[in-house]
Structures are given as C-alpha cells and as structure tokens.
Amino acid sequence: MIRIQLGAYQHREDALASWTILKRRHTALLADLQPEVRQVDIDETRMYRLQAGPFSNVDDANLLCRRMLARESECLVIGH
C-alpha cells in the first residue's frame, strides 16, 4: 500500500492534531485521503508517524508530496 508520511511525533494526540491543521491548510490536496497514525519504537523512543493514503500508484503520491513540499509541509512517500 502506498501512503505519504506527513510527520512524526512523540505523542499520538500531536499527530492527530497535526492532521487537523494540515487538512485545514491543504484542504484540496488532502481531501480524498484517510489519515493513519502508526506507532513505531526506534531504539527506546516511541514515535507516532502521521500517514495518509492510500494511493493507487507511486506517481500520484510523488506528485502530492511535491505539492506539499512546495507549500513548506513535510511529505515522504512510503510503502513502494
């Protein structure tokens, strides 16, 4: 499954709050995407990655990330 990652946070609540802000700021770009917060443990640090998708192909995900980056928002294509 192809998704984009929009940030990583120390608290799940911060990831969810970030989605609300990003969705408001980039309504047209994120309108058809579903958020997902994924918990990961890196060394002894727990992080929560804010991801959105799914995308049917990597080209669409790359295009959206380029648009997000042009608007000074973080974006990384994952799952390809």
Predicted features by range, described:
Residues 10-80:
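Extracytoplasmic
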Residues 1-2:
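Short structural boundary motif marking the start of a folded domain
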